[in-house]
Regions:
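Extracellular carbohydrate-recognition regions
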Residues: 20-42
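Short tryptophan-centered beta-strand motifs in secreted/extracellular beta-sheet-rich domains
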Residues: 31, 80-82, 169-184
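Short carbohydrate-recognition loop motifs
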Residues: 46-64
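Secretory/extracellular carbohydrate-interaction modules
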Residues: 60-141
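Beta-strand-rich interaction surfaces with strong enrichment in secreted/lumenal proteins
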Residues: 66-72, 159-165, 207-208
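Short, aromatic/His-centered strand-loop micro-motif at the edge of beta-sheets
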Residues: 134-172
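Short, solvent-exposed beta-strand-to-loop segments that form ligand-recognition rims
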Residues: 187-204
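Ligand-recognition surfaces built from glycine- and aromatic
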Residues: 199-229
Length: 229
């Protein structure tokens, strides 16, 4: 019993410490207004706000997952927190994307992401990985024309971690960028972290929830930054 209490105390202290690293609220939305606020942007999205939550919906026959995003002044170190649930087995996955639309060296200004499925969390560096436009890498990847060396390089730009998330259950996801490291926790428990140069991009200015395809619900979304001098 004492060891369990001690472990709980350590976890609570760790969570408090992590929260203290990102004390400044950049944006938050609890979706209580039953409508998207004016700061929300969208791309090929059929998502709606209803019953106090964001219901992620990719329109039928769309060629791109639904994107619902928030823009802000660019920063390097950020924390995104969101409650989510996979409603049915139609919910394939969702992504938390960090982008810089002013950056022209990667497709769509993609910098890094955390991709969540019911069984897997994948962390990736898009800036220097699969979305890198340098030398035509992104186009060759789309056309399935990568060399063996390029495939090996791209394999170093992502890292996967197993999870087990039951359908219908609500969970709290926290994604943090700190320097060149991307870290994820779910329900207060660490899932994994990944270091790669592109993650350290110092002007992340857009965060997106990308739903593939439907039946992902979101609530209590926030973006936080580190304290400013």
């Amino acid at each position: 019993m004492k060891s369990s209490i001690a472990l709980l105390a350590v976890l609570l202290l760790a969570n408090v410490a992590l929260a203290a690293d990102y004390p400044r609220v950049i944006f938050s939305d609890d979706f209580s207004s039953n409508a998207f606020g004016p700061r929300w942007g969208h791309y090929k999205s059929g998502s709606v706000v209803k019953d106090g939550m964001l219901i992620g919906i990719t329109p039928e026959k769309s060629d791109h997952p639904a994107v619902d995003n928030i823009k802000f002044e660019g920063e390097r170190d950020l924390e995104v927190s969101v409650k989510f649930r996979f409603v049915s087995d139609k919910a394939k996955n969702f992504n938390v994307w960090f982008d810089d639309k002013d950056y022209k060296g990667s497709h769509a200004g993609h910098i890094c992401q955390a991709s969540i499925t019911p069984t897997n969390v994948n962390l990736s560096d898009a800036k220097t990985g699969g979305f890198d436009l340098t030398g035509g890498l992104y186009d060759r990847k789309k056309e399935n024309k990568l060399t063996a060396e390029e495939k090996a390089m791209l394999a170093t730009k992502a890292k996967a971690f197993p999870v087990k998330l039951a359908l219908q259950d609500w969970h709290t996801l926290v994604v943090q960028t700190k320097g060149d490291e991307l870290t994820v926790s779910i329900d207060g428990q660490p899932v994994g972290s990944f270091k790669s140069p592109g993650i350290g991009h110092d002007h992340k200015s857009l965060v997106s929830l990308t739903t593939n395809q439907i039946d992902v619900n979101y609530d209590d979304f926030s973006i936080k930054g580190v304290a400013k001098p």
